[in-house]
């Protein structure tokens, strides 16, 4: 498989090297906001950050957010190519999803009723997202609990026109899948608004795999609806506040287990509301944000109905302030509370934090910060970050990150109905990163190389007596991201990720250490070729190569380990714009070779070839 991939890659690259016109890639000049909570060029921060642009999202009309994230270096979304309604598990640099913090416009998303407080990606729609910033490595100093492996900041679309603008999307594809999206927005001097609605439905496929081909497993469909309303009110040219309300719900069917059909049903809903505000003063900006998430889940099976409710409050005030041309700081205070209804229990955490950014000399910069956390149950803990970087001739950035992080035990783990333990302590991590980012060949070729090492102590596991702090997790790996602008029309991008890890079980008799990255490949590669044929026609092709993995076979007791073969998926997209780009017709073909002889999860189906056609339009 690796040999075939290299041959394809060489052929694709070689066929384009004779192109005559030059262009550049400009990732180092790209402005991001997630790295340090203020706008900053990537060349000025030592943190590892990847941006999914609005153009890339626009060209993903046939995908959902899990499939888009699954294309990024170091990210595996297990379930992205399985039944559309199947639960999704996000792994960032080998860490499970409870160690990655999701933000929506800078405000955390959290479901206290979920396992480990993890947020369900199926509650998010890709259709009102402007861009996504992926910040890798421990970020607990600025973002608090769960930001151990990294932070993913989902940034919603903003109004851009003085007159009301209506945009829409209609798609139809395989498995009788339909999606419709409508968006109305306007931006004036005083008021701006963005109203969005999406409806998405599919018949899907059977979640469980029928190895006999004769059992006639039923299809497990999925339906999602989401609405969003965001207002922006400019009280003065220095003070602005934005109330928002988002509601999302989905329902569908799921099967009993590996290779086992069942008429089970599930539903979930999210009410997400709050307020963001900012005040600009002479040397900086003050922000005050509030967010509230209410998540409800309902599972119905032969064992009856199971309902969970989770409520999450987030209040944060912070300022970014310029002390001088070369010294900048961010200082803030954050309060969060987590509540479940069965039993009725609330946890809270209060955290002041401070981070300094220094431009020490020409090309040299550093970030140094700390965060103190007071939890109403376990007490206090502290995290720190140190991120020096050096920019050479504006085209080579060298960086080192030395950080600590933490994950507070969830309210479910502390006081939930199953195996809870009120004496749990926070999981604590230490992460080291080093690498370089550079642009060469007149900035036509840009690449980033990063190595990381992460250890997590006091890992919370579910043992014979319920939840307990017991084990130690150690993960390490490397990532490569490269982009080459062949000419003004053709670009080639590739990313590669390697991750390895092991857990040390601290048992009463002796410690046991073994590889435990279930469903995560050691090697993962994505290759993209993009071709702007002319000002109206865009074509892209991508190849995903996923290495072999391990999983557990739960059809036997005790569960036994099974090997999952590696696989390669080839996708093609084409879009054609009309009427001064107010109308775009597109086709998205996923898994063009119809490969179905692999598993993401042992015993569960994957999608074969899936053709989606659709239109983007604006009035």
Predicted regions and their residues:
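Outer-membrane beta-barrel signature, preferentially recognizing the C-terminal barrel domain
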Residues: 260-276, 280, 377-378, 387, ...
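Conserved C-terminal beta-signal and adjacent last beta-strands/turns
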Residues: 6-9, 19, 233-234, 400, ...
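Extracytoplasmic beta-strand/coil segments of soluble accessory domains associated
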Residues: 66, 70-108
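Periplasmic-side early beta-strands and strand-to-turn transitions of outer-membrane beta-barrels
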Residues: 153, 161-163, 171, 186-266
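Short acidic/polar hinge/loop motifs at secondary-structure boundaries
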Residues: 108-136
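Gram-negative outer-membrane beta-barrel transporters
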Residues: 360-362, 453, 470-554, 593, ...
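N-terminal periplasmic accessory domains that precede
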Residues: 65-68, 88-91, 100-103, 119-124, ...
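N-terminal periplasmic "start-of-domain" segments of outer-membrane beta-barrel proteins
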Residues: 30-58, 89
């Amino acid at each position: 498989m690796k040999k075939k991939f290299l041959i394809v890659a060489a052929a694709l690259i070689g066929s384009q090297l004779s192109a005559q016109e030059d262009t550049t890639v400009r990732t180092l000049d790209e402005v991001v906001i997630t790295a340090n909570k203020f706008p900053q060029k990537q060349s000025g921060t030592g943190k590892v950050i990847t941006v999914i642009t609005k153009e890339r999202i626009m060209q993903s009309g046939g995908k959902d957010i899990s499939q888009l994230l699954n294309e990024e270096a170091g990210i595996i979304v297990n379930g992205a190519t399985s039944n559309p309604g199947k639960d999704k598990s996000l792994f960032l640099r080998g860490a499970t999803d409870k160690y990655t913090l999701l933000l929506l416009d800078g405000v955390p998303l959290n479901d206290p009723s979920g396992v480990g407080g993890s947020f369900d990606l199926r509650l998010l729609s890709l259709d009102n997202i402007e861009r996504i910033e992926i910040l890798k490595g421990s970020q607990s100093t600025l973002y608090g609990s769960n930001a151990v492996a990294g932070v993913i900041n989902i940034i919603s679309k903003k109004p851009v026109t003085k007159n009301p603008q209506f945009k829409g999307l209609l798609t139809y594809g395989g498995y009788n899948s339909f999606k419709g999206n409508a968006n109305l927005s306007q931006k004036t001097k005083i008021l701006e608004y963005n109203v969005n609605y999406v409806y998405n439905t599919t018949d899907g496929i059977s979640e469980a795999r029928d190895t006999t081909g004769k059992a006639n497993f039923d299809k497990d469909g999925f339906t999602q609806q989401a609405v969003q309303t965001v207002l922006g009110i400019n009280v003065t040219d220095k003070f602005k506040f934005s109330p928002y309300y988002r509601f999302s719900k989905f329902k569908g069917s799921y099967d009993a287990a590996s290779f086992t059909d069942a008429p089970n049903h599930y539903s979930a809903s999210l009410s997400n509301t709050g307020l963001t505000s900012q005040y600009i003063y002479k040397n900086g900006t003050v922000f005050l944000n509030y967010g509230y998430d209410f998540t409800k889940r309902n599972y119905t099976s032969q064992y009856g109905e199971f309902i969970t409710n989770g409520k999450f409050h987030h209040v944060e005030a912070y300022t970014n302030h310029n002390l001088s041309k070369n010294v900048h700081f961010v200082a803030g205070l954050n309060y969060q509370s987590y509540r479940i209804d069965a039993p009725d229990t609330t946890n809270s955490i209060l955290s002041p934090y401070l981070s300094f950014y220094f431009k020490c000399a020409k090309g040299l910069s550093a970030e140094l910060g700390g965060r103190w956390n007071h939890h109403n149950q376990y007490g206090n803990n502290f995290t720190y970050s140190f991120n020096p970087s050096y920019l050479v001739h504006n085209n080579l950035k060298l960086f080192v990150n030395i950080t600590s992080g933490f994950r507070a035990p969830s309210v479910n783990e502390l006081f939930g109905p199953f195996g809870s333990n009120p004496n749990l302590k926070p999981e604590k991590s230490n992460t080291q990163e080093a690498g370089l980012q550079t642009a060469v060949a007149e900035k036509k070729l840009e690449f980033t190389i990063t190595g990381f090492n992460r250890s997590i102590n006091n890992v919370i596991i579910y043992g014979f007596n319920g939840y307990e702090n017991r084990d130690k997790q150690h993960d390490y790996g490397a990532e490569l991201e490269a982009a080459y602008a062949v000419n003004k029309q053709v670009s080639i991008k590739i990313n590669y990720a390697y991750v390895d890890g092991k857990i040390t079980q601290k048992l009463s008799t002796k410690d046991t250490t073994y590889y435990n990255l279930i469903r995560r490949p050691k090697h993962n590669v994505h290759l993209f070729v993009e071709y702007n044929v002319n000002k109206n026609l865009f074509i892209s092709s991508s190849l995903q190569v996923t290495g072999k993995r391990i999983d557990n076979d739960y059809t036997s007791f005790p569960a036994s380990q099974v090997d999952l073969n590696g696989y390669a998926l080839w996708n093609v997209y084409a879009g054609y714009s009309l009427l001064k780009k107010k109308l775009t017709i597109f086709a998205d073909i996923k898994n063009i070779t119809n490969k179905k002889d692999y598993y993401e999860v042992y015993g569960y189906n994957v999608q074969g070839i899936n053709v989606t056609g659709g239109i983007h339009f604006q009035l």
